[in-house]
Each structure stands twice: as structure tokens, then as C-alpha cells.
């Protein structure tokens, strides 16, 4: 079992890094965990739609280069399916029962994910209709994956 969180951009703030490290340690009891960061594309503050698409394309190529062919890709998208914590646990459990064991959760940059990445996705997951900073989403995601494993194992975890 392997969980990869693949994200555009680098975690800079110490407090985000500490939170991630804590959940990596906790999750390590259930699964191999890997965090992969790909560089975000340098871009001006204001861009045309065409320029935004070009940025997404370049970031998308970097993301896709990190995904193995056998991986189950779960993209984080505003338009994705919203699940409860129990729902995420059930989704992962069903996929594991089907023999899937290499999960890659993909978090895009500030402009979102390129269509090529969306096309590679096996499941589109949404945490909210709201937009969150991608650094924060890494922490929220890894916590929810940890919570899902606790639920799957029937272990207590605070609510």
C-alpha cells in the first residue's frame, strides 16, 4: 500500500511542514507515504486565458511525469465528488479490495489542473465548493487520508 500526495509548488512555512510531518508519521503505521512537489510555473499576476492554460499545461506535464502507469489517480477538484470522512474510507477500501494499492492524490497550483491531468484521473474528489490555499489542502488531505485508515481499521479517532 502506497499513498502519494503530488502537489504543485513548495511548502515554505514551517508550520505546514510540521503538520505534514506529524501526519506522515501517523500514516506510516498504515501505508507508505510520499510527498512529491513539482515546481509551479512562474507567471505574472494577471494573465490572459491563453496564458493561464499554458501555465496549467506546463505544471500538468510535471505532474504527469511523476505518475506511474499502474497508479490510481485521485485529483482534488472543486467539481469533484464531495464525500464524508466515512465516504472517503469506503471509496479507498473498495479500490483496495479491487487490488488497487498505489494511490496518487493530485493537488494543482493556483490556476487548477490541466485537462491532461484531469483525463488521467480515476476519481475526482472535492473537499468543498470553496477554494483553499494548496499548502493548506495538503494538510487537510493527509489528515483525511489518515482518518480514513483509522475508520477502515475500526480504530478510535477524535471527531
From Swiss-Prot:
Pfam families, per database record: SPOUT_MTase (PF02590)
Compartments, record wording: Cytoplasm
EC numbers on record: 2.1.1.177
Residues annotated to bind S-adenosyl-L-methionine: 76, 108, 127-132
Matching CDD domains: RlmH-like
Alphabetized SUPFAM superfamilies for the sequence: alpha/beta knot
InterPro entries referenced in this protein's UniProt entry, alphabetically: Alpha/beta_knot_MTases, RlmH-like, tRNA_m1G_MTases_N
GO cellular component: cytoplasm
Reactions accelerated catalytically: pseudouridine(1915) in 23S rRNA + S-adenosyl-L-methionine = N(3)-methylpseudouridine(1915) in 23S rRNA + S-adenosyl-L-homocysteine + H(+)
Domain of life where this protein originates: Bacteria
Keywords carried by this UniProt record: Cytoplasm, Methyltransferase, rRNA processing, S-adenosyl-L-methionine, Transferase
Complex and partners: Homodimer.
Free-text function comment from the UniProt entry: Specifically methylates the pseudouridine at position 1915 (m3Psi1915) in 23S rRNA.
Entry protein name: Ribosomal RNA large subunit methyltransferase H
Upper taxonomic lineage: Bacteria, Bacillati, Bacillota, Bacilli, Bacillales
Amino acid at each position: 500500500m502506497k499513498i502519494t500526495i503530488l502537489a504543485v509548488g513548495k511548502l515554505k512555512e514551517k508550520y505546514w511542514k510540521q503538520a505534514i510531518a506529524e501526519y506522515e508519521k501517523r500514516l506510516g503505521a498504515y501505508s507508505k507515504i510520499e510527498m512529491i512537489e513539482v515546481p509551479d510555473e512562474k507567471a505574472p499576476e494577471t494573465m490572459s486565458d491563453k496564458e493561464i492554460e499554458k501555465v496549467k499545461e506546463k505544471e500538468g506535464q510535471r505532474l504527469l511525469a511523476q505518475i506511474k502507469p499502474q497508479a490510481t489517480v485521485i485529483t482534488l477538484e472543486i467539481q469533484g465528488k464531495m464525500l464524508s470522512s466515512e465516504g472517503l474510507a469506503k471509496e479507498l477500501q473498495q479500490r483496495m479490495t479491487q487490488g488497487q494499492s498505489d494511490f496518487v492524490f493530485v493537488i494543482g497550483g493556483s490556476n487548477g489542473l490541466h485537462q491532461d491531468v484531469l483525463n488521467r484521473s480515476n476519481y475526482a474528489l472535492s473537499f468543498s465548493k470553496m477554494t483553499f490555499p494548496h499548502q493548506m489542502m495538503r494538510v487537510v488531505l493527509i489528515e483525511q487520508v489518515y482518518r480514513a485508515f483509522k475508520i477502515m481499521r475500526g480504530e478510535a479517532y477524535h471527531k
